[in-house]
Curated annotation (Swiss-Prot):
Keyword terms of this UniProt record: Calcium, Disulfide bond, EGF-like domain, Extracellular matrix, Glycoprotein, Growth factor, Repeat, Secreted, Signal
SUPFAM superfamilies: EGF/Laminin (SSF57196), Growth factor receptor domain (SSF57184)
Claim: Iron is one of the keywords in the record: no
Tree of life domain: Eukaryota
A Gene Ontology biological process term: epidermal growth factor receptor signaling pathway
SMART domains named in the record: EGF, EGF_CA
Name of the protein in question: EGF-containing fibulin-like extracellular matrix protein 1
Main location: secreted
Record-linked PANTHER family: PA14 DOMAIN-CONTAINING PROTEIN, UROMODULIN-LIKE
Source organism of the structure: Rattus norvegicus (Rat)
GO cellular component, as recorded: basement membrane; extracellular matrix; extracellular space
Subunit structure: Interacts with ECM1. Interacts with TIMP3.
Amino acid sequence: MLQTVFLTMLTLALVKSQVTEETITYTQCTDGYEWDPVRQQCKDIDECDIVPDACKGGMKCVNHYGGYLCLPKTAQIIVNNEQPQQETPAAEASSGAATGTIAARSMATSGVIPGGGFIASATAVAGPEVQTGRNNFVIRRNPADPQRIPSNPSHRIQCAAGYEQSEHNVCQDIDECTSGTHNCRLDQVCINLRGSFTCHCLPGYQKRGEQCVDIDECSVPPYCHQGCVNTPGSFYCQCNPGFQLAANNYTCVDINECDASNQCAQQCYNILGSFICQCNQGYELSSDRLNCEDIDECRTSSYLCQYQCVNEPGKFSCMCPQGYQVVRSRTCQDINECETTNECREDEMCWNYHGGFRCYPQNPCQDPYVLTSENRCVCPVSNTMCRDVPQSIVYKYMNIRSDRSVPSDIFQIQATTIYANTINTFRIKSGNENGEFYLRQTSPVSAMLVLVKSLTGPREHIVGLEMLTVSSIGTFRTSSVLRLTIIVGPFSF
């Protein structure tokens, strides 16, 4: 009976022992590792590859098992593959203790390596041992097995800082950016990291301490081709007058003002960065350098036209007085009305002068003179009335310009009949009361009428020139008169 009771109690003890024993499986890893479903083990996370700006202050990031180090860029790294002392897996699983002295990320730490990375406390995760000596670093690369987290729902786990236990009893990252537990400023952007977060500045800003300050892009050329204007968080380029931004918003290209908005009144010439206006012939630029004003050529010079200058838009023209016509655009030429149209009668002859014409009788002879040839009147010897008068009167006509320069030879008188043993003398008989003329004998049979005072037209001046012929032996004496009509034109041309 006692034997039966003992067996029964032994069986119950065994059953009770089996019920209270907890079966633990491992599917999660400690911080710095992740589960590899293929190898069915935890593998190291390369924080230097996934953590932005893992190291500060110009330090370089060196990944190791379960964490990373920030070392000076001049540091010499010596890898020691010796296996570090490790606790048994049972001890590792139960306590989480490790022999390594370095842990990574933002776990509870007792010290910080400058530039980033952490030195773990005694409760840190297992990892490689780092030995330092001035600027030499020895890293044991053989890792201890990472701590695995039991997946039993009834087991309460302790997660590292930045992690929390999920409903599946695994340590999952806390997204501080979405949960609002970050301490980023309003002008910063929160970026979640595995087990932590970082605060980045908005584009166009850079961190200075804990604050974000504007980046002055204009102080670091060459952002812009010509002008640069810095704005909060950005900048923009601007061009000098006469230029505009190209499609790349950086380069400045010339504005062709002559094609776009031609402001010139007449001619436009584009130049680099500007334009100039020019005017057609006969115009000049106004004070605004855009419009054109007519040039009054007639006011600039009094020698453009022989008679009268008439200003016109962009040009000028010359006019001549009545009786003249314009030749070669500027000079005036007399119109010979006697060859074209005149109002003289049939018994009159037309005499043209500078600027007009006159009609004179074809027979100018007065009694007792008779017409013997053109403009020559002779007094017959048989007529008793001809004894004390000149034997002949010749009518001549000439025209001169007004204000002719003096002295000037204007007319020559010459004997048509030459007698032997005679002496010819010449004198001005009439028409020289004001002394405008002088008669100079040039030969025994001729003389020259000289104008010694200027005559201003229009006027008609009649001068009587007499040639007296006397026989050297005193046998006879005779005289002839030349009645010269001088027509002075109204102008000096």
